[in-house]
Design a protein with these regions (language model features):
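Generic detector of well-ordered alpha-helical segments enriched in charged/polar residues
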Residues: 165-172, 176, 218, 273, ...
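Intrinsically disordered, low-complexity Ser/Thr/Pro-rich tracts
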Residues: 1-132, 173-176, 183-185, 201, ...
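Signature of long, low-cysteine stretches enriched in small and polar/charged residues
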Residues: 178-245, 251-260
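Intrinsic-disorder-associated interaction segments
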Residues: 33-37, 41-46, 50, 67, ...
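Low-complexity, polar-biased intrinsically disordered regions enriched in Pro/Ser/Thr/Gly
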Residues: 111-125, 187, 224-233, 258-273
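Residues at structural and domain junctions
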Residues: 5, 9, 234, 288-295
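Surface-exposed amphipathic alpha-helical segments
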Residues: 252-313
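A short acidic-to-branched-hydrophobic micro-motif
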Residues: 123-188, 249-251, 258-259
């Protein structure tokens, strides 16, 4: 109950006491209260005075302070995505990568129109429109293959080519399972389709890029039995974006310190044919034993270029 209400009640009690005392007095010209009435009146007056004093001394109510305003938390600062030293960033359409400066003098790109030759055509004669990136002044001038990166739309390729569909499924299976050991004659998935056969692989390794993953390896394609040499081998990367929207094929000439530039024809060609499988297995093992820096360009540099690749949304 509030103090003002208490004061009012006490004053009312005092008035009632006085009235009660007055009822006991005789009607005379001079009213003289008895001792009980006087004591009651004094008590009521004292309580009223105490209540008034307490009300005066009570501190005035104060409002609770408003909570201090807090500044919104700032988002974390992201590290700037800049090319590594010694590389140059290239962006063509929605494809981006950082090329080591010593790999080539210049980089070009073009949109290759779709080639639709029908279901009976050779697989290499069928492909959707795709982005082709080529290199001028490549570090290895004498090679059978031309350096190129191709970026293909997966859905468009699958719509027109069953061999491409099979290749994407094989590649995806490899990327999901990532076997620890890959046989030299595994016949790894590879695009573009050439009119020749993959005779071996070496230095196979799964490498992720910023928008997906893939497998890189060394290989050589041939239409006949022929020794492995630097002129014919190449480095390739076969990758899929994480959303399976794009396929990336990289074909780059490469040299190994363990191989001749141009192999000589075997002295006994028939014996070479009969032992060709053993020869390829031994060649693959020899290349697998080579350090990454024993190749030109080095496997370390090429892996870093792969890791820098990005499909821009």
């Amino acid at each position: 109950m509030k103090k003002s209400e208490s004061t009012w009640i006490l004053a009312s009690i005092a008035l009632l006491v006085l009235c009660a005392a007055a009822c006991k007095l005789p009607f005379s010209s001079t009213a003289v209260p008895d001792d009980a009435a006087t004591a009651a009146l004094q008590l009521a007056q004292t309580q009223v005075g105490i209540s008034a004093t307490q009300t005066a001394l009570a501190p005035a109510p104060t409002e609770a302070p408003a909570p201090a305003a807090t500044e919104p938390a700032l988002p974390p600062t992201l590290e700037p995505d800049t090319p590594a030293p010694g590389t140059t960033r290239y962006t063509f359409g929605n494809f981006q990568f950082d090329m080591p400066d010593y790999l080539a003098l210049d980089v070009n790109h073009t949109i290759v129109p779709a080639a639709l030759e029908g279901d009976e055509a050779f697989p290499g004669a069928i492909q959707p429109e795709y982005l082709s990136i080529t290199f001028d002044g490549y570090i290895i001038p004498d090679a059978f293959h031309s350096p190129e990166i191709g970026v293909y739309p997966v859905a468009d390729y699958m719509e027109i080519s069953q061999p491409a569909t099979d290749t994407f499924e094989e590649l995806n299976y490899l990327l999901v399972n990532r076997p620890q050991t890959i046989p030299y004659d595994a016949g790894l998935p590879f695009i573009p389709f050439w009119n020749a056969g993959q005779i071996f692989n070496a230095q196979a390794k799964f490498v992720d890029f910023k928008s997906g993953s893939g497998i890189r390896f060394l290989s050589m394609y041939a239409q006949a039995v022929y020794p492995v040499d630097n002129y014919n081998i190449f480095f390739t990367y076969q990758g899929l974006s994480a959303d399976h929207a794009y396929f990336i094929s990289m074909v780059l000439p490469i040299n190994s310190a363990a191989l001749p530039m141009h192999a000589e024809d075997p002295a006994d060609y028939e014996a070479f044919i009969n032992s060709f499988s053993t020869y390829l297995q031994e060649t693959s093992a020899m290349l697998n034993a080579e350090a990454p820096e024993r190749f030109t360009p080095t496997l370390t540099v090429l892996d870093a270029m792969i890791a820098s690749m990005r499909i821009i949304p």
